[in-house]
Amino acid sequence: MASQLRLRSALALVTGAGSGIGRAISVRLAAEGAAVAACDLDGAAAQDTVRLLGNPGSEDREPRGKHAAFQADVSEGPAAKRLLEQVQACFFRPPSVVVSCAGITRDEFLLHMSEEDWDRVIAVNLKGTFLVTQAAAQALVSSGGRGSIINISSIVGKVGNIGQTNYASSKAGVIGLTQTAARELGRHGIRCNSVLPGFIATPMTQKMPEKVKDKVTAMIPLGHMGDPEDVADVVAFLASEDSGYITGASVEVSGGLFM
């Protein structure tokens, strides 16, 4: 539970924090006691998220300046490095919890998908996750600190989905990236895990036609869409020492969809 304050001494960097799952993760980690560096391509949205966060180490819901918002396009190498530098300059330490949640979709059938739409989705979802993971790991190793890196993939990365060749490929890549990072970084005390959300109620899924939502919901054994908070619960667990012997895992949060 949040009242345990499992992350009282942690600094958490969350990308894609401006809405949906990223925002819910930021709120949950703050409720667990972490100081949160909320990053989004939309800097104003990141600021809005920070306003929702309570004071780290307390159950007070009023912001006390213990969190900070950042703007960055994580698909660009210099921007990702600069983000980590800015976070360290602001908090005087590297983040010990890093959650890569920044992601986009540009759906189209394989026969008609443009190279531009393929490249952009791969750049944000996969390359961006790589760049943030690399920069955060470098900062942690340099400081001698332990950490938990949590990359948000998707159940689609495991099973594929019609009209999402680019998205499915990017999220499958996130799983492979995270497992490899876990093998390489374990000796430094850095755990790396991925989370695979299923059909979650977010601004991204709200754009889907109702008949499509109904069709997918009917395939979920638990009978309903998930909430962003369902994903945030798992991320909080993986960020904490309650999962201290877990690394390289891919945790599905899907209500049983596609199991």
From Swiss-Prot:
Substrate binds at residue 154. GO terms for molecular function: (3R)-hydroxyacyl-CoA dehydrogenase (NAD+) activity; estradiol 17-beta-dehydrogenase [NAD(P)+] activity; NADH binding; quinone binding; testosterone dehydrogenase (NAD+) activity. It comes from the Eukaryota. Keywords: Acetylation, Fatty acid biosynthesis, Fatty acid metabolism, Lipid biosynthesis, Lipid metabolism, Mitochondrion, NAD, Oxidoreductase, Phosphoprotein, Steroid biosynthesis. Gene3D superfamilies: NAD(P)-binding Rossmann-like Domain (3.40.50.720). It is found in: Mitochondrion matrix. Pfam families: adh_short_C2 (PF13561). Coiled coil: none annotated. Pathway: Steroid biosynthesis; estrogen biosynthesis; Lipid metabolism; fatty acid biosynthesis; Lipid metabolism; mitochondrial fatty acid beta-oxidation. It catalyses: a (3R)-3-hydroxyacyl-CoA + NAD(+) = a 3-oxoacyl-CoA + NADH + H(+); 17beta-estradiol + NAD(+) = estrone + NADH + H(+); testosterone + NAD(+) = androst-4-ene-3,17-dione + NADH + H(+); 17beta-hydroxy-5alpha-androstan-3-one + NAD(+) = 5alpha-androstan-3,17-dione + NADH + H(+). GO terms for biological process: androgen metabolic process; estrogen biosynthetic process; estrogen metabolic process; fatty acid biosynthetic process; protein heterotetramerization. Belongs to the short-chain dehydrogenases/reductases (SDR) family. This is (3R)-3-hydroxyacyl-CoA dehydrogenase.
